[in-house]
């Protein structure tokens, strides 16, 4: 090695910097009177973790991650100082958090066909807000399948209830979206172009239940790809292949009449109710509004997480659109370079996460004052990103489901900067258990063939629930996967 290189390396090892170690998690925080500590700039994460454990006097070491200016330290302190033009004379504020806890496989529930959509009912899920009907340990999972049936499962992988057949008020084609509205009501939609509302009841013992059709909502002229529910305002958004976003009421009395041209039979045009058989009749209603503007199939639509009068939608036309749901007016359009397939609001960061056909996730600031369209790009998937969900434990966490057969967990603090701007890499990847059971855990399926993930949900009690082409619901759980600080 060149003597000058040896000298530079030696100087880096000998350099020191004052660091102020802090944590927002009270149970691992150092005493308030802990002042700045002089440490070698050559230290990396492992050495810093050892230092903090020694200062805390831990008998059993806790693995820590370290953040400087909101980003994880992935190099030595010296390399960080050099890359960011910071003097070693500066007192460096370093925050530490518990390191990632990998989510473990808990269970898998098998279906007869592809599972397109899942939702969870738990004490913390949106559908149970204001209700004491769900107790811890009585969580339910709702699945929608390509076989046209809804199923409600308990946590022991038992099917408690199944929706009726088409002749008894069920879907007549594949289901693409299913959501709990409340502990006693469900919404679903699919390739039969209808949004359907259901009453859900359980027997007292909790081992059996019924899914009974209540209302059929007509308005779309092509299949429906996704649903979003805002229970407290009795509203639903639907994203359809007909290029429109549907805006609906879950209250039959608030909904207008169904468009006669879209009703399934000539007989129904003379009646508000369709007689299915001697015991079943289902009300038919129309949309509050159809939001027009997209020029290609709409893949996803959601409510603003903090303002239910605002909606967002994404489409194969490469655009993200913002809607005023009070006036049904288009407010803003952000155009990207790729088809957008999934959508999730990150309100604490004023960002919308959009899954793309180009295998990455683009974070977009929807505010009119935003200078650029893309605030950050998350890279790691090898096929289309079709489902997104927020981490219920951390404002920095996000999970994605992809046609590559994996779910990836992202921490918005785990970023780096390249010529294209801020780029994030996933902190954990969850593969399909079905591959492992086939003895093919390390084999790569081209494009995720046979194991494509179609839907993912992240619930505080149940964990990470995903479903897809392998005809399974898969549950993974890790307590506090990401730090919430």
Curated annotation (Swiss-Prot):
Bias kind Low complexity: ranges: 255-268
Role according to the record: Component of the NOP7 complex, which is required for maturation of the 25S and 5.8S ribosomal RNAs and formation of the 60S ribosome.
Location of this chain's protein in the cell: Nucleus, Nucleolus; Nucleus, Nucleoplasm
WD repeats: 110-163, 170-208, 219-258, 293-333, 335-374, 380-420, 448-485
Keyword Cytoplasm applies: no
UniProt region (Disordered), positions on chain: 252-278
Highest classification ranks of the organism: Eukaryota, Fungi, Dikarya, Ascomycota, Pezizomycotina
Pfam families in alphabetical order: NLE, WD40
SMART domains: WD40
Top-level taxonomic group: Eukaryota
Family in the record: Belongs to the WD repeat WDR12/YTM1 family.
Keywords: Nucleus, Repeat, Ribosome biogenesis, rRNA processing, WD repeat
InterPro entries recorded: G-protein_beta_WD-40_rep, NLE, WD40/YVTN_repeat-like_dom_sf, WD40_repeat_CS, WD40_repeat_dom_sf, WD40_rpt, WDR12/Ytm1
Quaternary state and interactors: Component of the NOP7 complex, composed of erb1, nop7 and ytm1. The complex is held together by erb1, which interacts with nop7 via its N-terminal domain and with ytm1 via a high-affinity interaction between the seven-bladed beta-propeller domains of the 2 proteins. The NOP7 complex associates with the 66S pre-ribosome. Interacts (via UBL domain) with mdn1 (via VWFA/MIDAS domain).
Region of interest: Ubiquitin-like (UBL) domain: 17-98
Protein's GO biological process: chromosome organization; maturation of 5.8S rRNA from tricistronic rRNA transcript (SSU-rRNA, 5.8S rRNA, LSU-rRNA); maturation of LSU-rRNA from tricistronic rRNA transcript (SSU-rRNA, 5.8S rRNA, LSU-rRNA); protein-RNA complex remodeling; ribosomal large subunit biogenesis
GO-annotated molecular function: ribonucleoprotein complex binding
Gene Ontology CC terms, in alphabetical order: nucleoplasm; PeBoW complex; preribosome, large subunit precursor
Official protein name in the record: Ribosome biogenesis protein ytm1
């Amino acid at each position: 090695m060149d003597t000058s290189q040896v000298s530079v390396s030696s100087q880096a090892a000998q350099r020191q910097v004052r660091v102020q170690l802090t944590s927002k998690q009270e149970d691992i925080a150092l005493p308030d009177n802990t002042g700045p500590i002089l440490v070698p700039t050559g230290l990396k994460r492992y050495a810093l973790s050892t230092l903090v454990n020694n200062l805390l006097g831990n008998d059993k070491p806790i693995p820590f991650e370290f953040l400087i200016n909101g980003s994880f330290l992935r190099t030595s302190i010296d390399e960080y100082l050099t890359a960011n033009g910071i003097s070693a004379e500066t007192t460096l504020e370093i925050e530490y958090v518990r390191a990632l806890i990998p989510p473990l496989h808990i269970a898998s529930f098998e279906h007869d066909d592809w599972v397109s959509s899942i939702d969870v009912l738990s004490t913390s899920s949106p559908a149970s807000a204001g209700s004491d009907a769900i107790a811890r340990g009585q969580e339910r999972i709702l699945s929608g399948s390509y076989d046209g049936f809804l199923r409600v499962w308990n946590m022991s992988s038992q099917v408690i209830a199944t929706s009726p057949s088409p002749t008894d008020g069920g879907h007549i084609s594949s289901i693409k979206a299913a959501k709990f509205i409340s502990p006693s009501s469900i919404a679903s939609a699919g390739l039969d172009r209808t949004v359907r509302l259901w009453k859900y009841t359980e027997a007292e013992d909790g081992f059996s239940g019924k899914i009974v059709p209540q209302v059929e909502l007509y308005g779309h002229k092509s299949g429906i790809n996704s649903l979003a529910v805002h229970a407290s305002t009795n509203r639903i958004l639907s994203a359809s292949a007909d290029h429109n976003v549907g805006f609906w009421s879950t209250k039959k009395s608030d909904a207008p009449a169904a468009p006669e041209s879209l009703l399934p039979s000539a007989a129904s045009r003379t009646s508000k109710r369709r007689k299915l058989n001697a015991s079943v009749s289902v009300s038919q209603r129309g949309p509050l509004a159809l939001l027009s503007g997209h020029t290609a199939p709409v893949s996803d639509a959601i409510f603003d997480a903090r303002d239910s009068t605002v909606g967002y939608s994404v489409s194969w036309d490469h655009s993200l659109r913002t809607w005023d749901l009070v006036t049904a007016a288009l407010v803003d359009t952000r155009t990207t370079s790729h088809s957008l397939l999934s959508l999730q609001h990150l309100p604490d960061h004023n960002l919308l996460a959009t899954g793309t056909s180009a295998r990455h996730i683009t974070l977009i600031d929807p505010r009119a004052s935003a200078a650029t369209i893309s605030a950050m790009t998350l890279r790691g998937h090898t096929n289309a990103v079709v489902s997104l969900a927020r981490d219920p434990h951390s404002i920095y966490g996000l999970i994605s489901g992809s046609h590559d057969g994996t779910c990836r967990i992202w921490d918005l603090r785990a970023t780096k900067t390249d010529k294209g701007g801020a780029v994030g890499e996933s902190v954990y990847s969850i593969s399909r258990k079905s591959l492992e059971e086939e003895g093919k855990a390390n084999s790569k399926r081209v494009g995720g063939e046979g194991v494509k993930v179609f839907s993912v949900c992240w619930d505080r009690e149940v964990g990470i629930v995903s479903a897809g082409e392998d005809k399974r619901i898969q549950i993974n759980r890790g307590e506090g996967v990401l730090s919430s600080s």
